[in-house]
Amino acid sequence: MPAVIASNPNAYALERARKAGIPTYVVARKSYPSSKAMTVALVEQLQALHIDLVVLAGFMVILTSEMVQAFPNAILNVHPALIPSFAGPGCYGLHVHEKALEYGVKLSGATVHFVSEECDGGPIVSQKAVEVLPDDTPEILQRRIMENCEWKLLPQAVSLFCQGRLKVEGRTVRILD
């Protein structure tokens, strides 16, 4: 892993990376006059590091088209719902789980997908579901999905990408043997 870049200077991932001797960088949205300016800085940083794959985890910024175009089918995101449900602008963090509970779904989960110019609309790599229990709160459901889905799916998807086993065909991602 060549670097960990965070939008939040207090992200625990930065501390973990430092302890592992991995270079860290913070690209905070508020440090730039616009999303586009932040994206330009981020793309320049990633290209300078010769990055092949960008992995988003808890990155609460919708990427601009410039970023997506700079890394086509090379940005993975984990979303805390079964896309296409509870996805798109405004569906992040606890909001996703609040909406799932309000809707009365029986299953929720996580999706790892390639990032496209449509928010949460890229080709799906993998999904995993958990049961929604009668006494769930948004916080309890969020924790169950993180531990049982997100934390398992994302490393698996990264591994498959690094092994050259993901093939994007339109909206479909095939996992090669």
Regions found by a protein language model. Give the residues of each.
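One-carbon transfer enzymes
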Residues: 1-177
